[in-house]
Structures are given as structure tokens and as C-alpha cells.
């Protein structure tokens, strides 16, 4: 990620004596498995009690002879796991998963499919919904802030936003009335001829069969049911704000 160098520069400039830091990003490799039978697959490959790993839990597990760190996370809204291992083990791990997954009908899917499915869950991603240019209050990430924690970078500014009038824009999910093209990012959002926001990312949701987008819109308009206009490939399209997570709104599948 482009943020790695930015963070490493800050760490290097602010290290205290006798403290060392090393970026291990190139030493590890990750993949994810998703679907209602992913737990069965993982359980068959390890002797540990990974079946008891709770949603959002993480731990160290051996898959065969491969040491891994597994998190029970889901970007696509299904029961799933994210698995990380050393770079030298990734080919063996991939082969092991594909071979043992045949009995469950396993197959690989691409990055665009992942992006489509995460839109159906209203899951934002770095460099689109989340950047240094957007505040936690704008994107909803303020729910993860521990306000009782000692001073940290951005605490004062974030607290002033929280205790004041709030952010001037908020992240929302849109359903776009378009059958031939989808939003991709940075398209303007209009209301009564006035620009009131912009798209952060978009695509087609194949499970819900709708053109979807996420975007930042003026706070006074950021309510479900609000009708707006979006320019896609130079053409004005009707759109409306919808409740988050149009696919499996209660998140029952990924918590299965």
C-alpha cells in the first residue's frame, strides 16, 4: 500500500532510543477463502480448534507443515478466513487449499469479483473510501476510536469534530439507476443542479442485481431514501441513498 512508506518515514523520524522497526510486508503473503463451507475446509486442514475461532478473531495455526496466522474476517460478506504465511510457503499453501477444497467445489475468484461483493456489504477500502484526506467522522471509522485513550495523533481534531457540528460530509451507499454502465470513482453527485458530493467507488452487485456505489455526500442530505443524480461516463443517472449492506443486512452469513 502507498501508506507503508508514509508510515515508515514517520516511525523512523520518531523512534525512541533502543527501539527498532522493520517492515515485514514483503516477507509475508496472504489469501482469503470465502463461502458457507470455508470452515469445513479449514477444519480439515488443521488439528487445532479453529472451528471455535469467533468472528473477527485471529490466531496462529498450522496448516499441514505451514505456519500461518488466520483471521476470521470477511470482505465479501460470506463466512470466511484470511490466511497469512511466509512468502516461501504461499505456493504450497495455495495448492493445499485447492486440492483439499475440491470436495467442496472450491474455485478461485478475481479481485474485481471481490470489489463487487464488498460493495454489496458497504465495506469501504483504503485509497477509495479511506484516505488521509477524509476524517474518521466522515467515513464512520470514529466508532473504532477509544476516546479514553491517552493523547494520540489526530485525537484533538477528531474530538472537536465529534463534539462540534460533526463532519460536513458522510459516507453513504447508493443504488444507481443504470443498466449499461457503473460508477468507478470520483463522479460528481448532484442535487437540484448543485454538486453535493462525489463517488468514492462503484460497480455492479451481482448477488443483489443492482448497480451500486459508495460516496461522500453533504451531511444534511445523507439519509436513506434521498434521491440524487450521478454522472456516469458523462451521462446523468438517477440514484438514491439506501441502507448499508444491501446484501445480508444483518451479517448472518459471515457470522455463521
Task: State where each predicted segment sits.
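Conserved, structured C-terminal
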Residues: 1-256
Amino acid at each position: 500500500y502507498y501508506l507503508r512508506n508514509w508510515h515508515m518515514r514517520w516511525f523512523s523520524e520518531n523512534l525512541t532510543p533502543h527501539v527498532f522497526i522493520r517492515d515485514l510486508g514483503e516477507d509475508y503473503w496472504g489469501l482469503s477463502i470465502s463461502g458457507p463451507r470455508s470452515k469445513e475446509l479449514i477444519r480439515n486442514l488443521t488439528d487445532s480448534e479453529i472451528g471455535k475461532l469467533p468472528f473477527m478473531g485471529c490466531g496462529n495455526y498450522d496448516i499441514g507443515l505451514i505456519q500461518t496466522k488466520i483471521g476470521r474476517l470477511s470482505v465479501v460478506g460470506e463466512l470466511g478466513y484470511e490466511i497469512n504465511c511466509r512468502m516461501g510457503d504461499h505456493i504450497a499453501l495455495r495448492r493445499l487449499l485447492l486440492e483439499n477444497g475440491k470436495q467442496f467445489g472450491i474455485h478461485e475468484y478475481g479481485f474485481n469479483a471481490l470489489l463487487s461483493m464488498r460493495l454489496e456489504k458497504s465495506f469501504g477500502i483504503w485509497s477509495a473510501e479511506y484516505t488521509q484526506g477524509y476524517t474518521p467522522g466522515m467515513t464512520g471509522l470514529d466508532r473504532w476510536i477509544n476516546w479514553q485513550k491517552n493523547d494520540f495523533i489526530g485525537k484533538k481534531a477528531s474530538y472537536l469534530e465529534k463534539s462540534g457540528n460533526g463532519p460536513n460530509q458522510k459516507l453513504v451507499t447508493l443504488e444507481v439507476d443504470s443498466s449499461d454502465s457503473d460508477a468507478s470513482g470520483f463522479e460528481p453527485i448532484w442535487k437540484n443542479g448543485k454538486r453535493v458530493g462525489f463517488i468514492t467507488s462503484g460497480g455492479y452487485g451481482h448477488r443483489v442485481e443492482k448497480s451500486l456505489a459508495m460516496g461522500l455526500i453533504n451531511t444534511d442530505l445523507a439519509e436513506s431514501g434521498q434521491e440524487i443524480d450521478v454522472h456516469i461516463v458523462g451521462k446523468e443517472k438517477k440514484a438514491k441513498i439506501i441502507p448499508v449492506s444491501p446484501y445480508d443486512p444483518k451479517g448472518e452469513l459471515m457470522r455463521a
